[in-house]
Amino acid sequence: MATYTHFGKQPDVLKHLILCEVLRNEHPQVYVETNSACAIYPMQQTSEQQYGIYYFLEKAVEEDNQVLKDSIYYKIESAEMQKGYYLGSPALAMEVLGRQAQKFLFFDIEKSALDNVERYAKQAELQTSVHLYLSLIHI
């Protein structure tokens, strides 16, 4: 999974913040992710993550940022970060939608990423709703 170094960086945090709010409001029956990557990552505290997820968590608890602190993303990610882990979009989708969704379809080009998603789905007791697809690249 060496190719997945984007987690916890600024663009990833913004994407996840928006994703969680959309899922919370829309409640889709089927969730599809074409480039899923992993569900959960051990944190590494890189400088990019310092300006990404760590900065977000720090600023969310400030007095004038109640909207961020009240976000579903903050609630989910801050709890996981206290354990030393960062949730990717597959885990966030499973956490926000839970059993409300009938199916989760995850596609990726790396089997190890899909194995990671599968382990998280079992932990969340959603394995019967989660379907994994290894994408093949043709040049």
Locate the predicted segments by residue.
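Conserved small/polar residues in nucleotide/adenosyl-binding loops
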Residues: I137-I139
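SAM cofactor-binding core of SAM-dependent methyltransferases
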Residues: L17-S135
